[in-house]
């Protein structure tokens, strides 16, 4: 066996092992845990010498006074004495432990509301594909994720929705599904199969809603399609957040879409008509509307750095970093599939074999936050907010809700115990807790 084949086999085994560990951990009851001596970074700002305590259900206390930390630990049955505290260099993330972060940054878990896969698997690939792809993103700090499903024949999309629905009860990290298609403009289809694109007539809307069984969180729709505005109203009435994207809509039509109930712009700048002083298009319509969350792929390829800074500045507290990550994320260059379409990944950039169209990214939210701070000059609080609180707000997950129970996106009492520790120099994720379960 060649050395490269052996290395590939070892990598597959390692990733399957981590996916199994995630499965087991999320299936077990959570235990109290605490973290101290961290640099807290969330949407509310930065704080030094910070600590956090969870009772195994939610965050119950935070602060920067040592005496308060000991009392908070005692209230959930933990011992804050020095002899019982593990350091980040030890096996300190065991359930029920008290961890000394040794000055590492502590952030909420990242929330990705638009991603298709990772680790060689797509969210369209059934239970096994979802397990592996979610493990890949979990490894890099994405504790909660909306699973994006690519355009396929309607029967296939319905079956994929049913799979996501079936996994949600056992997987608190899965927030639901996002349908990117099939109601997209042919002229802005990007890496979607043109043979599967449709006008969103009521029959198709009803079929997808029925198959989803309540798991559908968002759906991208080109509002200029004949039934586009009506479909936006129908999905919004059913509790789904429609997104304007993959469209050729003018400014007025995009405004109609948002007024009809669309609450998201799918990856701003990509797969839509751009900014023009006499033909403003959909972007200003989204920027002007305080109800709209704006997705942005901060990889420097989908959107180059000057436009990332400009776009974020349009609506800094409404712009959510998303990855649009496909199966090749965190994998070597090579040949992959996006739905039924062939994709070549070269230098980490995914393009369709057929016409060279960009075919998703190989980005993680870990990398998006790193780029924002270390390359683009974002403040730490702004960068973290774009990967935590802002995407959570798009679906009301920033407050108590039936899906996540506790709100997401802040390190504050009452919020979900989704916590990351990061290397302060590189912003690389080193430790992960999801729903109070230690996963890395």
Residue ranges with predicted function:
Residues 3-79, 85-90, 426:
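N-terminal metal-binding scaffold of metallo-dependent hydrolase/deaminase domains
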Residues 284-294, 312-325, 329-422:
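His/Asp/Glu-enriched, well-ordered alpha-helical/loop segment
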Residues 34, 109-111, 243, 321-322, ...:
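Residue-level marker for buried hydrophobic side chains located in beta-strands
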Residues 116, 131-160, 173-185, 212-224, ...:
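Divalent metal-dependent hydrolysis catalytic cores, especially in the metallo-beta-lactamase
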Residues 136-146, 185-213, 255-268, 272, ...:
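Active-site gating loops and adjacent loop-to-helix segments of metal-dependent hydrolytic enzymes
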Residues 104-105, 113, 123-173, 196-211, ...:
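Alpha-helical scaffold segments that flank or form the walls of functional sites
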Residues 206, 210-331:
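Active-site core of metal-dependent hydrolases
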């Amino acid at each position: 066996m060649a050395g490269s084949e052996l290395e590939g086999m070892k990598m597959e085994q390692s990733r399957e092992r981590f996916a199994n560990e995630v499965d087991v951990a999320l299936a077990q009851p959570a235990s109290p845990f605490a973290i101290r001596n961290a640099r807290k970074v969330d949407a509310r700002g930065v704080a030094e010498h910070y600590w956090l305590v969870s009772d195994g259900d939610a965050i119950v206390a935070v602060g920067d006074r040592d005496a308060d930390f000991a009392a908070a630990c005692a209230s959930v049955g933990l011992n804050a004495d020095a002899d019982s505290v593990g350091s980040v260099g030890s096996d300190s993330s065991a359930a029920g432990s008290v961890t000394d972060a040794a000055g590492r940054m502590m952030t909420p878990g990242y929330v990705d509301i638009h991603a298709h896969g990772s680790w060689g698997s797509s969210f369209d690939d059934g239970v096994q594909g979802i397990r592996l792809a979610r493990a890949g993103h979990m490894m890099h700090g994405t504790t909660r994720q909306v699973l994006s499903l690519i355009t396929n024949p309607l029967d296939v999309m319905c079956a994929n929705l049913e799979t996501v629905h079936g996994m949600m009860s056992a997987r608190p990290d899965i927030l639901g599904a996002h349908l990117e298609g099939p109601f997209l403009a042919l002229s802005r289809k990007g890496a979607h199969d043109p043979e599967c694109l449709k006008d969103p007539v009521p029959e198709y809307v009803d079929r997808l809603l029925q198959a989803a069984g309540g798991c559908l969180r968002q759906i991208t729709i080109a509002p200029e399609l004949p039934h586009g505005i009506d479909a936006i109203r129908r999905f919004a009435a059913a509790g789904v957040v429609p997104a304007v994207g993959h469209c050729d809509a003018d400014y007025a039509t995009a405004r109609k879409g948002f007024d009809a109930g669309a609450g998201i712009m799918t990856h701003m700048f990509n797969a839509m008509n751009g900014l023009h002083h006499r033909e403003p298009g959909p972007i200003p319509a989204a920027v002007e509307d305080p109800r709209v969350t704006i997705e942005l792929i901060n990889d420097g390829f989908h959107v180059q750095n000057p436009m990332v800074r400009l776009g974020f500045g349009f609506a800094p507290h409404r712009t959510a970093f998303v990855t649009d990550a496909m199966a090749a994320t965190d994998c070597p260059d090579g040949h992959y599939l996006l739905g039924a379409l062939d994709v070549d990944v070269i230098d980490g950039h995914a393009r369709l074999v057929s016409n060279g169209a960009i075919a998703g990214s190989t980005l993680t939210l870990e990398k998006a936050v790193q780029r924002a701070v270390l390359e683009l000059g974002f403040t730490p609080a702004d960068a973290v907010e774009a990967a935590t609180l802002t995407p959570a707000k798009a679906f009301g997950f920033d407050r108590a809700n039936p899906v996540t129970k506790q709100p997401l996106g802040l390190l504050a009492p009452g919020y979900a115990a989704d916590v990351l520790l990061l290397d302060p120099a590189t912003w690389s994720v080193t430790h992960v807790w999801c729903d109070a379960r230690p996963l890395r």
